[in-house]
Amino acid sequence: MIDTLSFCGREEAITRMNCFGSEGRPFFFLIDYIAEKCLVEEPHRLPSSELLFAFPGATNVPQGMPATPHPRSFRWEPCPMSFEEYRRGFDIVHRHLHGGNSFLVNYTCATLVDTDLTLRQVFDHARAPYRLWVNDSFVVFSPEIFVRITDGFIYSHPMKGTMDATLPDARER
């Protein structure tokens, strides 16, 4: 196990991913949205004191590690952006979709949340199959997988709500 998280740049991240991939070794990767701060490491080497992940079938949460106490009551007040701010971003996305620059977009926006919970408490108690906590810097939790590797191929799947609702079995899919 490494003692501390070691982030690298885009080129080194690509090199590390190619190396692990060519050797058939599983690896964990985390990349910021501009690919300047990247983490590429074998899962068993990640220090659980700085990064925890819990995915179906893969986790580095030590067995028997106690969860943080769940407070009986807590403050959780989302502070979403205004409709006007959201609309400006949506209009940009819409313009680019119609311009042919993309065919699928996951338009997400940061939402501040005023809470008295720690990020670790959010990680421990989130009811989501995909969870990540990074050194009290941020936490991620999601109900869905976005990409899947099967038989050497990478597949992306539309998120719920993006399927054509007119398909005969849309509700079941």
Regions inferred by a protein language model and the residue ranges of each:
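Extended alpha-helical targeting/anchoring segments
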Residues: 1-173
